[in-house]
Amino acid sequence: MKILEFNDKRGSLKLHVENEDDLWLLHIIIKKGDRIVAKTTRDISMGKDSRRIPMTIELQVEYTEFQNFTTRLRIHGLILDAPERFGIKGAHHTVNLDIGDEVIIIKEQWSNYELEKIREQEEKKGKLLIALVDVDEYIIALLMKQGVKILAEKSLQTPGKDNDVVNENIEEMANEIISFVKLTGVNVIIIAGPGPFKDMVNQKIKQIDNKLIVYVDSVSSASRAGLNELLRRDIIDQVYREFEIAQQLKILESIMENLAKNTGLVVYGIEDIKKANELGAVDKLLITEDYLTDTGREIIDELLRDIEKKKGKIMIVPKDSPIYYQVKNLTGIVSLLRFRIN
Protein backbone atom coordinates (compact mmCIF):
# COMPACT_ATOMS: atom_id res chain seq x y z
CA MET A 1 0.00 0.00 0.00
CA LYS A 2 1.20 3.48 -0.80
CA ILE A 3 -0.13 6.65 0.83
CA LEU A 4 -0.39 9.28 -1.92
CA GLU A 5 -2.02 12.14 -0.02
CA PHE A 6 -3.62 12.83 3.37
CA ASN A 7 -5.79 15.90 4.00
CA ASP A 8 -6.50 16.05 7.72
CA LYS A 9 -8.97 18.96 7.48
CA ARG A 10 -11.06 17.22 4.82
CA GLY A 11 -10.58 13.79 6.37
CA SER A 12 -9.47 12.36 3.03
CA LEU A 13 -6.78 9.77 2.43
CA LYS A 14 -5.64 8.85 -1.09
CA LEU A 15 -4.11 5.38 -1.46
CA HIS A 16 -2.59 3.14 -4.11
CA VAL A 17 -3.49 -0.55 -3.66
CA GLU A 18 -0.48 -2.85 -4.15
CA ASN A 19 -1.56 -6.31 -3.00
CA GLU A 20 -4.33 -8.51 -1.60
CA ASP A 21 -3.44 -7.68 2.01
CA ASP A 22 -4.06 -3.99 1.25
CA LEU A 23 -7.57 -4.84 0.06
CA TRP A 24 -8.24 -6.89 3.17
CA LEU A 25 -7.14 -4.02 5.42
CA LEU A 26 -9.39 -1.57 3.53
CA HIS A 27 -12.28 -4.01 4.02
CA ILE A 28 -11.68 -3.71 7.77
CA ILE A 29 -11.18 0.07 7.80
CA ILE A 30 -13.89 1.31 5.40
CA LYS A 31 -17.14 1.59 7.39
CA LYS A 32 -20.78 2.37 6.74
CA GLY A 33 -21.18 6.13 6.29
CA ASP A 34 -17.65 6.68 4.97
CA ARG A 35 -17.26 8.12 1.49
CA ILE A 36 -14.95 6.96 -1.27
CA VAL A 37 -13.91 8.48 -4.59
CA ALA A 38 -12.82 5.95 -7.20
CA LYS A 39 -12.90 5.07 -10.88
CA THR A 40 -15.63 2.63 -11.90
CA THR A 41 -17.84 1.62 -14.83
CA ARG A 42 -21.65 1.65 -15.05
CA ASP A 43 -24.26 0.62 -17.59
CA ILE A 44 -25.81 3.79 -19.05
CA SER A 45 -28.88 3.74 -21.30
CA MET A 46 -28.26 5.20 -24.76
CA GLY A 47 -31.69 5.21 -26.38
CA LYS A 48 -32.60 1.58 -26.97
CA ASP A 49 -29.11 0.40 -26.14
CA SER A 50 -26.89 0.62 -23.08
CA ARG A 51 -23.14 0.98 -22.79
CA ARG A 52 -20.76 0.41 -19.90
CA ILE A 53 -19.17 3.82 -19.35
CA PRO A 54 -15.99 4.48 -17.32
CA MET A 55 -16.29 7.36 -14.82
CA THR A 56 -15.12 8.65 -11.45
CA ILE A 57 -17.77 8.76 -8.72
CA GLU A 58 -18.14 9.58 -5.04
CA LEU A 59 -19.92 6.84 -3.11
CA GLN A 60 -21.41 6.83 0.39
CA VAL A 61 -20.53 3.40 1.74
CA GLU A 62 -23.20 0.98 2.95
CA TYR A 63 -21.00 -2.12 3.27
CA THR A 64 -17.94 -3.86 1.81
CA GLU A 65 -17.35 -7.43 0.64
CA PHE A 66 -14.01 -9.19 0.50
CA GLN A 67 -13.39 -12.84 -0.28
CA ASN A 68 -10.03 -14.25 0.81
CA PHE A 69 -7.57 -15.20 -1.95
CA THR A 70 -9.22 -12.89 -4.49
CA THR A 71 -7.86 -9.60 -5.76
CA ARG A 72 -11.02 -7.55 -5.48
CA LEU A 73 -12.84 -5.57 -2.79
CA ARG A 74 -16.48 -4.79 -3.54
CA ILE A 75 -17.73 -1.51 -2.02
CA HIS A 76 -21.51 -1.04 -2.07
CA GLY A 77 -23.27 2.26 -1.52
CA LEU A 78 -25.15 5.28 -2.86
CA ILE A 79 -23.74 7.59 -5.52
CA LEU A 80 -23.23 11.09 -4.06
CA ASP A 81 -21.45 12.61 -7.03
CA ALA A 82 -20.97 11.62 -10.67
CA PRO A 83 -20.93 13.33 -14.08
CA GLU A 84 -24.25 15.23 -14.36
CA ARG A 85 -25.00 14.00 -17.90
CA PHE A 86 -25.54 10.43 -16.67
CA GLY A 87 -28.22 11.31 -14.09
CA ILE A 88 -27.19 8.62 -11.60
CA LYS A 89 -26.85 10.58 -8.35
CA GLY A 90 -28.65 8.80 -5.52
CA ALA A 91 -28.53 5.42 -7.28
CA HIS A 92 -27.07 2.29 -5.72
CA HIS A 93 -23.72 1.22 -7.12
CA THR A 94 -20.84 -1.17 -6.43
CA VAL A 95 -17.22 -0.12 -6.90
CA ASN A 96 -14.80 -2.99 -7.55
CA LEU A 97 -11.42 -2.06 -6.07
CA ASP A 98 -8.53 -4.12 -7.43
CA ILE A 99 -4.75 -4.34 -7.09
CA GLY A 100 -3.17 -1.36 -8.85
CA ASP A 101 -6.18 0.93 -8.29
CA GLU A 102 -6.25 4.26 -6.50
CA VAL A 103 -8.98 5.27 -4.05
CA ILE A 104 -9.76 8.28 -1.86
CA ILE A 105 -11.36 7.44 1.49
CA ILE A 106 -13.16 10.25 3.33
CA LYS A 107 -14.13 9.93 7.00
CA GLU A 108 -15.70 12.31 9.51
CA GLN A 109 -12.81 11.38 11.79
CA TRP A 110 -9.86 9.07 11.25
CA SER A 111 -8.88 7.13 14.36
CA ASN A 112 -5.22 6.86 15.32
CA TYR A 113 -5.66 3.09 15.14
CA GLU A 114 -6.85 3.22 11.51
CA LEU A 115 -4.06 5.55 10.41
CA GLU A 116 -1.44 3.50 12.24
CA LYS A 117 -2.62 0.28 10.57
CA ILE A 118 -2.38 1.93 7.15
CA ARG A 119 1.11 3.26 7.92
CA GLU A 120 2.16 -0.20 9.14
CA GLN A 121 0.87 -1.71 5.89
CA GLU A 122 2.86 0.84 3.88
CA GLU A 123 6.00 0.18 5.93
CA LYS A 124 5.76 -3.62 5.50
CA LYS A 125 7.73 -3.36 2.28
CA GLY A 126 10.80 -2.23 4.12
CA LYS A 127 12.64 -4.76 6.22
CA LEU A 128 13.40 -7.80 4.11
CA LEU A 129 16.89 -9.01 3.24
CA ILE A 130 17.39 -10.96 0.01
CA ALA A 131 20.53 -13.01 -0.61
CA LEU A 132 21.13 -14.74 -3.94
CA VAL A 133 23.95 -17.28 -3.70
CA ASP A 134 25.84 -19.63 -6.00
CA VAL A 135 29.08 -21.57 -5.55
CA ASP A 136 31.26 -18.67 -6.71
CA GLU A 137 29.17 -15.49 -6.42
CA TYR A 138 26.54 -13.76 -4.34
CA ILE A 139 24.44 -10.63 -4.21
CA ILE A 140 22.73 -9.25 -1.10
CA ALA A 141 19.94 -6.67 -1.31
CA LEU A 142 17.58 -4.86 1.05
CA LEU A 143 13.95 -4.55 -0.04
CA MET A 144 12.55 -1.20 1.07
CA LYS A 145 9.32 0.64 0.29
CA GLN A 146 11.40 3.03 -1.86
CA GLY A 147 12.79 0.13 -3.88
CA VAL A 148 15.72 -2.31 -3.77
CA LYS A 149 19.16 -1.36 -2.47
CA ILE A 150 22.14 -3.56 -3.39
CA LEU A 151 24.24 -4.03 -0.23
CA ALA A 152 26.92 -6.41 -1.55
CA GLU A 153 27.84 -8.06 -4.83
CA LYS A 154 30.91 -10.27 -5.14
CA SER A 155 32.54 -13.04 -7.16
CA LEU A 156 34.52 -15.73 -5.30
CA GLN A 157 37.02 -18.42 -6.21
CA THR A 158 35.46 -21.18 -8.29
CA PRO A 159 35.65 -24.37 -6.19
CA GLY A 160 36.34 -27.03 -8.81
CA LYS A 161 36.88 -30.28 -6.89
CA ASP A 162 38.21 -28.52 -3.80
CA ASN A 163 35.74 -28.92 -0.91
CA ASP A 164 37.78 -26.50 1.19
CA VAL A 165 36.98 -23.70 -1.25
CA VAL A 166 33.28 -24.64 -1.15
CA ASN A 167 33.28 -24.46 2.65
CA GLU A 168 35.20 -21.15 2.63
CA ASN A 169 32.66 -19.65 0.22
CA ILE A 170 29.75 -20.87 2.34
CA GLU A 171 31.40 -19.42 5.45
CA GLU A 172 31.99 -16.03 3.83
CA MET A 173 28.46 -15.78 2.44
CA ALA A 174 26.79 -16.80 5.71
CA ASN A 175 28.87 -14.34 7.75
CA GLU A 176 28.23 -11.55 5.26
CA ILE A 177 24.47 -12.18 5.38
CA ILE A 178 24.49 -12.24 9.20
CA SER A 179 26.45 -8.98 9.32
CA PHE A 180 23.84 -7.26 7.14
CA VAL A 181 21.04 -8.69 9.29
CA LYS A 182 22.61 -6.97 12.30
CA LEU A 183 23.28 -3.77 10.37
CA THR A 184 19.76 -3.39 8.93
CA GLY A 185 17.79 -4.84 11.84
CA VAL A 186 15.80 -7.25 9.66
CA ASN A 187 14.52 -10.52 11.05
CA VAL A 188 13.34 -12.15 7.82
CA ILE A 189 15.60 -13.33 4.99
CA ILE A 190 15.02 -14.87 1.58
CA ILE A 191 17.91 -16.99 0.30
CA ALA A 192 17.68 -18.02 -3.34
CA GLY A 193 19.88 -19.41 -6.05
CA PRO A 194 20.31 -22.19 -8.59
CA GLY A 195 20.91 -25.76 -7.42
CA PRO A 196 21.47 -27.07 -3.88
CA PHE A 197 24.15 -24.54 -2.81
CA LYS A 198 21.55 -22.16 -1.33
CA ASP A 199 20.48 -24.90 1.11
CA MET A 200 24.08 -25.30 2.31
CA VAL A 201 24.33 -21.55 2.98
CA ASN A 202 20.98 -21.67 4.79
CA GLN A 203 22.22 -24.51 7.04
CA LYS A 204 25.33 -22.50 7.92
CA ILE A 205 23.22 -19.45 8.80
CA LYS A 206 21.03 -21.61 11.05
CA GLN A 207 24.17 -22.81 12.85
CA ILE A 208 25.22 -19.22 13.49
CA ASP A 209 21.77 -17.88 14.46
CA ASN A 210 18.86 -20.32 14.64
CA LYS A 211 16.37 -17.59 15.59
CA LEU A 212 16.38 -15.99 12.16
CA ILE A 213 13.41 -16.66 9.89
CA VAL A 214 14.74 -17.81 6.53
CA TYR A 215 12.78 -18.62 3.36
CA VAL A 216 14.52 -20.51 0.55
CA ASP A 217 13.60 -20.22 -3.13
CA SER A 218 15.14 -21.01 -6.52
CA VAL A 219 16.27 -18.58 -9.21
CA SER A 220 18.31 -19.11 -12.36
CA SER A 221 21.37 -17.15 -11.18
CA ALA A 222 22.87 -15.27 -8.22
CA SER A 223 22.87 -12.01 -10.17
CA ARG A 224 20.84 -8.86 -10.70
CA ALA A 225 18.84 -10.74 -13.32
CA GLY A 226 18.10 -13.41 -10.69
CA LEU A 227 17.06 -10.67 -8.26
CA ASN A 228 14.59 -9.25 -10.77
CA GLU A 229 13.30 -12.78 -11.36
CA LEU A 230 12.62 -13.21 -7.64
CA LEU A 231 10.96 -9.80 -7.24
CA ARG A 232 8.44 -10.63 -9.97
CA ARG A 233 7.13 -13.58 -7.96
CA ASP A 234 4.46 -13.81 -5.25
CA ILE A 235 6.98 -15.03 -2.65
CA ILE A 236 7.57 -11.50 -1.30
CA ASP A 237 3.92 -11.01 -0.29
CA GLN A 238 3.79 -14.62 0.92
CA VAL A 239 6.80 -14.07 3.18
CA TYR A 240 5.30 -10.95 4.75
CA ARG A 241 1.99 -12.75 5.31
CA GLU A 242 3.59 -15.85 6.81
CA PHE A 243 5.83 -13.76 9.06
CA GLU A 244 2.79 -11.97 10.50
CA ILE A 245 1.05 -15.31 11.04
CA ALA A 246 4.19 -16.59 12.81
CA GLN A 247 4.10 -13.57 15.15
CA GLN A 248 0.43 -14.21 15.91
CA LEU A 249 1.13 -17.89 16.52
CA LYS A 250 3.81 -17.04 19.10
CA ILE A 251 1.37 -14.79 20.95
CA LEU A 252 -1.32 -17.49 20.89
CA GLU A 253 1.14 -20.11 22.17
CA SER A 254 1.98 -17.83 25.09
CA ILE A 255 -1.73 -17.27 25.74
CA MET A 256 -2.50 -21.01 25.76
CA GLU A 257 0.50 -21.74 27.99
CA ASN A 258 -0.63 -19.12 30.53
CA LEU A 259 -4.19 -20.43 30.43
CA ALA A 260 -2.96 -23.97 31.10
CA LYS A 261 -0.87 -22.76 34.05
CA ASN A 262 -3.69 -20.53 35.33
CA THR A 263 -1.29 -17.60 35.75
CA GLY A 264 -4.00 -14.96 35.58
CA LEU A 265 -2.17 -13.26 32.70
CA VAL A 266 -4.86 -13.91 30.08
CA VAL A 267 -8.30 -12.35 29.67
CA TYR A 268 -10.83 -12.77 26.86
CA GLY A 269 -14.20 -11.30 26.03
CA ILE A 270 -14.85 -7.61 25.48
CA GLU A 271 -15.89 -6.73 29.05
CA ASP A 272 -12.88 -8.33 30.75
CA ILE A 273 -10.53 -6.78 28.21
CA LYS A 274 -12.08 -3.36 28.83
CA LYS A 275 -11.41 -3.77 32.56
CA ALA A 276 -7.83 -4.88 31.91
CA ASN A 277 -7.27 -1.92 29.60
CA GLU A 278 -8.54 0.55 32.21
CA LEU A 279 -5.67 -0.65 34.39
CA GLY A 280 -3.16 -0.44 31.52
CA ALA A 281 -2.62 -4.20 31.68
CA VAL A 282 -3.17 -5.17 28.01
CA ASP A 283 0.17 -6.14 26.46
CA LYS A 284 -0.76 -8.12 23.31
CA LEU A 285 -4.23 -8.56 21.86
CA LEU A 286 -5.52 -10.90 19.16
CA ILE A 287 -8.86 -10.07 17.53
CA THR A 288 -10.56 -11.90 14.66
CA GLU A 289 -11.49 -9.87 11.60
CA ASP A 290 -15.19 -10.74 11.88
CA TYR A 291 -15.25 -9.70 15.56
CA LEU A 292 -13.82 -6.39 14.43
CA THR A 293 -16.50 -5.92 11.77
CA ASP A 294 -19.49 -7.48 13.59
CA THR A 295 -19.12 -5.72 16.95
CA GLY A 296 -20.35 -2.13 17.39
CA ARG A 297 -17.64 -0.20 15.54
CA GLU A 298 -17.61 2.82 17.84
CA ILE A 299 -17.15 0.63 20.93
CA ILE A 300 -14.38 -1.51 19.48
CA ASP A 301 -12.59 1.43 17.79
CA GLU A 302 -12.49 3.37 21.05
CA LEU A 303 -11.12 0.33 22.90
CA LEU A 304 -8.43 -0.40 20.31
CA ARG A 305 -7.37 3.24 20.18
CA ASP A 306 -6.99 3.32 23.96
CA ILE A 307 -5.03 0.03 24.03
CA GLU A 308 -2.57 1.40 21.46
CA LYS A 309 -2.23 4.67 23.38
CA LYS A 310 -1.12 2.55 26.33
CA LYS A 311 1.46 0.78 24.11
CA GLY A 312 -0.49 -2.44 23.69
CA LYS A 313 0.14 -4.46 20.50
CA ILE A 314 -2.96 -5.37 18.46
CA MET A 315 -2.99 -8.05 15.77
CA ILE A 316 -5.99 -8.75 13.54
CA VAL A 317 -6.49 -12.47 12.77
CA PRO A 318 -8.01 -13.10 9.31
CA LYS A 319 -10.39 -15.99 8.63
CA ASP A 320 -7.79 -17.84 6.58
CA SER A 321 -5.25 -17.79 9.44
CA PRO A 322 -4.31 -21.18 10.97
CA ILE A 323 -5.06 -19.75 14.43
CA TYR A 324 -8.43 -18.21 13.53
CA TYR A 325 -10.63 -20.89 15.14
CA GLN A 326 -8.57 -21.01 18.33
CA VAL A 327 -8.98 -17.26 18.78
CA LYS A 328 -12.66 -17.56 17.77
CA ASN A 329 -13.15 -20.16 20.53
CA LEU A 330 -11.79 -17.60 23.00
CA THR A 331 -14.69 -15.26 22.04
CA GLY A 332 -12.78 -13.72 19.11
CA ILE A 333 -10.87 -11.25 21.29
CA VAL A 334 -8.17 -12.35 23.74
CA SER A 335 -5.31 -10.58 25.49
CA LEU A 336 -2.02 -11.41 27.12
CA LEU A 337 -1.52 -9.13 30.13
CA ARG A 338 1.51 -7.31 31.49
CA PHE A 339 0.47 -8.13 35.06
CA ARG A 340 -2.30 -9.87 36.97
CA ILE A 341 -5.42 -7.81 37.62
CA ASN A 342 -7.23 -10.18 39.99
Swiss-Prot record:
The gene designation is pelA
Compartment(s) = Cytoplasm
Which NCBIfam families is this protein grouped with? pelota
The UniProt keywords, alphabetically, are: Cytoplasm, Endonuclease, Hydrolase, Metal-binding, Nuclease
Can you supply one Gene Ontology CC term for this chain's record? Answer: cytoplasm
Single GO BP term: ribosome disassembly
Report the principal subcellular site. cytoplasm
Task: Tell me which domain of life the UniProt entry assigns to the organism this sequence originates from.
Answer: Archaea
Cofactors needed by this protein, per the record, are: a divalent metal cation
InterPro entries from the xrefs? Answer: eFR1_2_sf, eRF1_1_Pelota, eRF1_3, Pelota/DOM34_N, Pelota_arc, Ribosomal_eL30-like_sf, Transl-rel_pelota
Q: What does this protein do?
A: May function in recognizing stalled ribosomes, interact with stem-loop structures in stalled mRNA molecules, and effect endonucleolytic cleavage of the mRNA. May play a role in the release non-functional ribosomes and degradation of damaged mRNAs. Has endoribonuclease activity.
Q: Name one Pfam family in it.
A: eRF1_1
User: SMART domains attached here?
Assistant: eRF1_1
What is the designated name of this protein? Answer: Protein pelota homolog
Any domain commentary?
The N-terminal domain has the RNA-binding Sm fold. It harbors the endoribonuclease activity.
